[in-house]
């Protein structure tokens, strides 16, 4: 039944879901399933496999909750056959909780106290609505604990209010009305005007619950978390009350007055607060999912940024008072030299700094400069551009986001125990240019600076989603097993931290891996981990050329057949494009291997050893713009997209503050999502449309 529910929810065929769920339950990873098990899934991509896994996890949690509910009600002796059937056929978490509510163990309530005083029968009389002499009948319930008939009726109404609050239809009425017509309303907490000035837009703001944007809702929630705002849901209480009265009060009711009071009390004290909490939690989950989705996509783009490749780099972490930290890295990213120069105020040793950089560039045959884009970045760029170096030496501005986090991390201390954080930070900047993916995996994704309200969303869900993105990117690119750090190996399908460390330790003790099969000699790396990981690990220059491809070892025999059929060797087949063009994939389809896998094999042979990431392009900011004071409305400037949100994109134009291109200014057409128009790292041309110097805000447009 689980697979059928998933298929219905996702609009994916049942056989595809069944095949995917079976593999997931066997311990297969999302990258492995989507890359190497296309016959089992009907060629589902990573996003679809991930969606199935998410639904499977949710339904597994629901099943566990269902068993708890059944056990609790059965323990009370109240589990009828009909009730069991309803619970077992329920696949909605909210509905399950509504069914369970009347049986759920409760803390002491007003209704509990009334029952303990023997007022349940009186509640039945009031709800029967036939007693025209209720006060006289209530007299029978006056005791030492119940002083008057009026007190007895009040207690009975407390019981009725609780019964109404536990009625599924009543809760659905309130839920439906508040959900469809309610508005999220934020109000300022009295006396917090000055402290909460940044939330001034939300001091008295309302947005329809059904359509409130994720960034607006999360801003309200953050204001509430900081004690500045109070959030509630406005709804038509009168209409809801009328609907509840129609359900619980009969025409000609003899106890209408008391029933109306019980309905009003139930709505105000019990149902509405409960449903409001539920709806706000659902809105928070929806907003979280949207914000996490934006963050995840930004992270994916950043991790897959174009690498410079294996080139010798001089990396500079710029600064004024403390100087610029300079490191020289070889083509593998190893640190070979470091120093500090002081070209900027207050020291101003410009000529000395320039000569130092010229000497380093010549001595180490530098092929590129990587300059951090933070404080003093543009000034340092000017310095390097004025060195008069060979035109073949390229210059790149590199984001510093996360570099300081890495430099102070355990990973950095382990790698560079004898260097301080400033040297480590410069190394990270240089390596981020050489290979962004290999460097960024060492940093907590939340520190990379491409999120939207990342500190306001569910942190567990955020971490899981970002880890999935990192895993996806690492496996998409693949890693060289003989040069990969334990940090990047951790994200390879089927490995994890322990096996990654074991691989690095084995490599240190035994030298480079000669082939993929040698992985099976790594301690604790068994057949299952090998199956999941092997296709994503590359052995460059080993004794089997297929080990430097995306072809899985389980399919090597197919390539060998292709070579034999062509009357050649595997080496020749890999080297000769014309031989590969003559391959007819359908000839190699059998009961074990389908056309999707064979097609992937042929494609992998064509792309063997190629990096799927784009080529890196050089870029220069406008040389006349260094501060917000240099900007004028109407200026057209080159820029780089640094962050994408639901409401637009932030663009670095070469000054301290990034400018915002609002979604309405991204194109001369309607844009539903900024991702339709831009991606991280994209070079764009923008026009300055607004400058708020006091608040450091810059408005930009990409419209023609």
Residue ranges of predicted features:
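Accessory alpha-helical DNA-binding modules that contact the DNA backbone or grooves
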Residues: 29-30, 45-147, 337, 476-615, ...
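Short, ordered loop/turn segments at secondary-structure junctions
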Residues: 36-38, 127, 236, 318, ...
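A glycine-rich phosphate-binding loop feature that marks nucleotide/adenosyl-phosphate handling sites
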Residues: 176-183, 316-320, 374-379, 398-405, ...
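Long, charge-rich intrinsically disordered scaffolds of nucleic-acid metabolism proteins
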Residues: 95, 396, 402, 407-477, ...
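Short beta-alpha connecting loops at secondary-structure transitions
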Residues: 17, 338-345, 368, 408-421, ...
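Duplex nucleic acid-engaging cores and interfaces of nucleic-acid transaction enzymes
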Residues: 45-51, 58, 62-315, 319-419, ...
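Low-complexity, acidic/Ser/Thr- and charged residue-rich accessory regions of DNA metabolism proteins
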Residues: 140-149, 205-206, 244-271, 275, ...
């Amino acid at each position: 039944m689980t697979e059928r529910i998933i298929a219905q929810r996702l609009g994916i065929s049942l056989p595809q879901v069944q095949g995917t769920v079976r593999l997931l339950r066997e311990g297969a990873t999302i990258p492995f399933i989507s890359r190497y098990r296309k016959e089992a899934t009907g060629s589902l991509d990573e996003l679809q496999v991930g969606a199935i896994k998410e639904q499977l996890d949710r339904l597994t949690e629901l099943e566990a909750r269902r068993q708890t509910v059944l056990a609790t009600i059965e323990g009370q002796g109240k589990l009828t056959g009909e009730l069991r059937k309803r619970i077992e056929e329920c696949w909605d978490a909210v509905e399950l909780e509504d069914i369970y509510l009347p049986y759920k163990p409760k803390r002491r309530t007003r209704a509990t106290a009334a029952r303990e005083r023997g007022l349940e029968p009186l509640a039945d009389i009031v709800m029967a609505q036939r007693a025209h002499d209720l006060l006289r009948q209530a007299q029978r319930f006056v005791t030492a604990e119940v002083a008057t008939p009026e007190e007895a009726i009040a207690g009975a109404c407390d019981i009725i209010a609780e019964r109404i609050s536990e009625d599924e239809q009543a809760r659905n009425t309130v839920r439906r009305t508040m959900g469809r017509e309610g508005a999220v309303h934020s109000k300022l907490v009295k006396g917090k005007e000055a402290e909460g000035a940044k939330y001034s837009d939300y001091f008295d703001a309302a947005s329809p619950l059904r359509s409130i944007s994720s960034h607006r809702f999360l801003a309200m929630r953050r204001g509430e978390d900081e004690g500045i705002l109070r959030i509630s849901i406005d709804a038509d209480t009168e209409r809801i009350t009328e609907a509840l009265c129609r359900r619980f009060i009969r025409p000609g009711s003899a106890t209408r007055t008391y029933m109306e009071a019980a309905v009003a009390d139930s709505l105000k004290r019990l149902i509405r607060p409960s449903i409001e909490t539920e709806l706000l939690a659902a809105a928070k989950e929806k907003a979280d999912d949207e914000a996490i989705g934006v963050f995840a996509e930004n992270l994916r783009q950043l991790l897959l940024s174009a690498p410079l490749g294996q080139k010798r780099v001089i990396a500079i972490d710029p600064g004024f008072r403390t100087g610029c930290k300079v490191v020289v890295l070889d083509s593998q990213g190893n640190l070979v030299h470091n120093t500090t120069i002081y070209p900027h105020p207050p020291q101003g040793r410009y000529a000395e700094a320039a000569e130092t950089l010229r000497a380093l560039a010549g001595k180490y045959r530098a092929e590129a400069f990587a300059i951090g884009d933070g404080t003093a970045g543009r000034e340092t760029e000017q310095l390097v551009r004025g060195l008069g170096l060979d035109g073949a030496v390229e210059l790149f501005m590199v984001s510093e986001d996360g570099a300081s986090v890495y430099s102070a991390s355990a990973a950095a201390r382990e790698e560079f125990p004898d260097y301080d954080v400033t040297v480590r930070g410069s190394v990270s900047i240089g390596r981020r240019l050489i290979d962004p993916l290999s460097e960024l995996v060492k940093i907590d994704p939340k520190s990379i600076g491409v999120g939207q309200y990342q500190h306001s969303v569910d942190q567990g869900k955020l971490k899981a989603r970002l880890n999935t993105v990192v895993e996806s990117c690492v496996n998409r690119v693949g890693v060289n097993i003989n040069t990969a750090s334990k940090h990047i190996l951790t994200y390879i399908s089927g490995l994890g931290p322990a096996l990654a460390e074991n691989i690095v330790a084995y490599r240190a003790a035994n030298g480079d891996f000669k082939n993929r099969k040698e992985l099976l000699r790594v301690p604790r790396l068994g057949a299952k981990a090998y199956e999941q990981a092997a296709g994503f690990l590359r052995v460059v220059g080993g004794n089997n050329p297929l080990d430097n491809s995306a072809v899985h070892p389980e399919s090597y025999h197919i390539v060998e057949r292709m070579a034999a059929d062509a009357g050649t060797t595997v080496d020749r087949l890999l080297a000769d494009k014309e031989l590969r063009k003559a391959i007819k994939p359908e000839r190699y389809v059998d009961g074990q291997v389908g056309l999707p896998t064979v097609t992937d094999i042929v494609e992998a042979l064509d792309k063997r050893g190629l990096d799927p990431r784009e080529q890196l392009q050089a870029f220069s900011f406008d040389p006349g713009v260094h501060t917000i004071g240099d900007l004028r409305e109407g200026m057209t400037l080159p820029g780089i997209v640094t962050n994408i949100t639901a409401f637009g994109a932030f663009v670095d134009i070469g000054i301290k503050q990034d400018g915002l291109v609002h979604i309405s200014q991204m194109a001369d057409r309607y844009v539903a999502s900024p991702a339709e128009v831009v991606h991280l790292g994209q070079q764009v041309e923008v026009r300055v449309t607004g400058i708020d110097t006091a608040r450091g805000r810059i408005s930009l447009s990409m419209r023609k």
